[in-house]
């Protein structure tokens, strides 16, 4: 994760954060014409949650960039053929006009600013593309909405991920964002739900007493979740919001 400081429990992040649905690979191929000649920069790659979907799109090369060295180490162990580099969105360690696509999974809100967009513009080839992807909770489910409200309370307010992105486009040499939406589901155990909350940077930073209070409140929410008898497995619906934009000449 790049920009403002992102810190999390890597084990919780790996275990509890949802993977991206297979439709993302199809979207990469269809929306961006990814093929065997494409070079893709995965910016803010973290531990490589998005990486398998990029690999499945069969590009020529994938370069993963992140400031969080420990996360990149996890990615490299999982995907040894990916070129991992330490760097930030404001100082991408790549040559000018060297990549066909910059893909950002679950991270653009950390560096949604003019400086980062100028740097992304620099490394993209002419008519290169930008992909912004987020997995979000389906707040139409009452207990999930309560979890989201608990998270916002701990954060001190909503994250406003999409609003930050929308304010920048069109502009800075990029076209208006085009949105696509995908749905999927993941089964979580009760322990997984606690680990999911721990994976958020704002929760990870809380003092021990406040974190314990948060988990106690989460336990009360969990009691309201409908589920089959003699199981601690719950269905967690996931919405994946994906945006595309194209680099255009700046007058």
Curated annotation (Swiss-Prot):
It holds the Pfam family Methyltransf_11. It comes from the Eukaryota. Keywords: Cytoplasm, Methyltransferase, Nucleus, Transferase. Its main location: cytoplasm. Probable methyltransferase. Signal peptide: none annotated. Belongs to the methyltransferase superfamily. This is Uncharacterized methyltransferase C25B8.09. The lineage of its organism: Eukaryota, Fungi, Dikarya, Ascomycota, Taphrinomycotina.
